[in-house]
């Protein structure tokens, strides 16, 4: 019987990732559609992705599929064809290529979830397939210059911090579930105005447009392919990219650079910086922005307290090694 999950240690997988020289592409895709047997669907995906040395994170739920993956470049066309033929619902699936191809994932993880994006929506009559109008880069740029159009960022606050469209409204939150509750209340005054919603790859803003329509908003739009799709389309058509800063990504890269503007600040000294790290003291692991100077000063920790704890931990480890 095949083992349909990872059995190699995280440390070893990370080591393999950093030493691998094979060119890879980082891809993302999603689709809202009904999946009857999620376990069977998940297992078939795992077997085939494993065969093509795919790494990454894939969620399967009765409402659809959501994936961020790293694929050997030589298998890209084969994998694309496989996905199109895997399920009729995935035929001509939109696949986003990342803006850079730095090392992103080190393990293949295919999980069954209740939902492919946690939204907290419990209304029985909510229809996620009733969505807003897709727009591409030319229309996005035009609407950004229209003062009557409202842009709403449907990403978490820490994502918004390092990059966003100018004048886009931030729905301050750390979860999408929380955002959906807030956005209806905060935007109640704009039910008859043009609203454009965006996120990284499209999955959150697509569901957000459904939620807005369900709650009586009349003119709702969203970026086809999210920020990633917008940037690719603008560059392809020679249009200015109006997104400022970096786009946060949920993998080893942490972010993708889109423009040269640095619009965020170091948590510790307040200087301009757009580099996210996790506190080096593993019991803390706080995600925060840190400049190069503070990285040296605090040993990549978020505070003096964590730095002291980290140094004490490392000293104890060194003493144990000596004693052996």
From Swiss-Prot:
Name of the protein: tRNA uridine(34) hydroxylase
Gene Ontology molecular functions: oxidoreductase activity, acting on paired donors, with incorporation or reduction of molecular oxygen
Family: Belongs to the TrhO family.
SUPFAM superfamilies: Rhodanese/Cell cycle control phosphatase
Chain's gene name: trhO
Database matches in Pfam families: Rhodanese, Rhodanese_C, UPF0176_N
Enzyme Commission number(s) of this protein: 1.14.-.-
NCBIfam families the UniProt entry points to: PRK00142.1-1
The Rhodanese domain, residue ranges: 145-239
Originating organism: Buchnera aphidicola subsp. Acyrthosiphon pisum (strain Tuc7)
PROSITE patterns in UniProt: RHODANESE_3 (PS50206)
Active site, renumbered: 199 (cysteine persulfide intermediate)
InterPro entries named among the record's database cross-references: Rhodanese-like_dom, Rhodanese-like_dom_sf, Rhodanese_C, TrhO, TRHO_N
